Design a protein with these regions (language model features):
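Alpha/propeptide regions of enzymes that mature by internal proteolysis
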Residues: 1-364
Length: 364
């Protein structure tokens, strides 16, 4: 099978893309310490000989979780790896969209290879779950997975390799925060997806030996930087998710239910014969306006603080009304006539005001 070299590690192992099997494969040329979240030979291991990440399906469900572990073993064999001595993870993301980032400090090198998609499955830790999991084996969820392969050219004890996983996860969450990705299951900012996987590999023969992988240590810094940057690049490649595309009212407030479809229902109240295509045309002329985008960001933050108990209902409603008044003035409208007494009132008032602003800006 044809292999395309994507990257050569400092230990001379290659990260290769195998188009025929829709996979990224790494074969180790020396013993490694491996920490894997995979169902296939997961946990801490010192006998793993290779790794793969592969595109397991297209849009929609893949297979039952009950069959997934067995399936991973079969995939390993197809890729020329020993199923008993390899670990692998799957995703709906395309391997062509993988991002690789390396950071160095003196002799230390940390490289992250990431595939990522969040459009259908972004979630926040603590969101309502879809199943219990102790006995039931449901179908796999919507496409949307962040898979991270992290290489460290240093040695460390197993506990610190586990600590590196914590830092790696924080780096992933920082990337989602900087892109303002919201949960698809709640009103919370996303911290990951429901199916994320991580594999961390370090070199037991390296003269570099670390007893810390937290944020105060240079190793922790490099882990955070590589993972954060690689996750952001992979999301751009897979979902066309960039800072520029997130400069949008509906992206900032999507997790609070403010979408083009919802705003269209408000538009129909304003113009009963309005058609959806007309509304989309009107809205897209205002969705990225600086005033509207930043007001929506402030409102999202205000609603977050209210939900988290950092702001009381009365002060949240009072400040929301001031923000909405600023919006009205920015678009040449007189005032916000609604009485605002709750978070639902805040969202309702914003939707009505946003529709009026779009209509006014387009001269209707």
């Amino acid at each position: 099978m044809k292999e395309i070299e994507l990257y050569r590690l400092s230990t001379d192992e290659k990260i290769v893309h195998v188009p025929e099997t829709r996979s990224i494969v790494v074969r180790f040329n020396a013993p490694k310490k491996v920490l894997s979240t995979s169902l296939l030979n997961g946990g801490y291991r010192e006998d793993i000989k290779g790794f793969f990440n592969y595109t397991c399906c297209g849009p929609g469900s893949c297979m039952s979780l009950e069959k997934y572990e067995e399936h991973l073993g079969k995939c390993a064999a197809v890729m020329g790896l020993d199923p008993a001595r390899s670990t692998g993870i799957g995703t709906a993301a395309r391997m062509e969209n993988a991002a690789i980032v390396e950071e160095t400090y003196e002799e230390l090198k940390v490289a992250a290879c990431v595939t990522a998609g969040v459009e259908g499955n972004a979630g926040c830790a603590g969101d309502p779950a879809g199943y219990y999991g102790a006995g039931a084996r449901p179908e796999m969820y919507k496409p949307g997975t962040i898979n991270i392969l992290l290489f460290i050219n240093a040695d460390m004890p197993p506990g610190i390799l586990t600590r590196a996983l914590v830092t790696c996860t924080e780096g992933k969450t920082a990337a989602l925060r900087e892109l303002m990705v919201g949960s698809r299951y709640s009103e919370n900012p996303a911290t990951g997806t429901g199916t994320d996987s991580t594999v961390i590999i370090c070199d037991p023969k390296s003269p570099l030996y670390f007893r810390s992988a937290g944020k105060h240590n240079k190793l922790g810094e490099l882990i955070g930087k590589t993972v954060k940057e690689a996750v952001k690049k992979a999301l751009g490649n897979q979902n066309h998710l960039y800072p520029s595309t997130q400069h949008s009212v509906t992206e900032r407030l999507r997790r609070y239910g403010v979408t083009e479809e919802v705003l269209y229902s408000y538009f129909r109240e304003y113009k009963k014969d309005g058609i959806e295509e007309e509304w989309r045309h009107l809205w897209r002329k205002i969705d990225r306006d600086s005033e509207m985008v930043f007001i929506s960001s402030f409102l999202a933050e205000l609603l977050d603080e209210y939900r988290w108990g950092l702001a009381g209902n009365e002060e949240a409603c009072r400040m929301a009304k001031k923000l909405l008044q600023m919006t009205a003035e920015a678009y040449g409208m007189r005032s916000v006539p609604m009485e605002i007494k709750s978070a639902e009132d805040i969202k309702d008032a914003f939707c009505r005001l946003a529709v009026q602003a779009a209509v006014k800006k387009n001269g209707i």
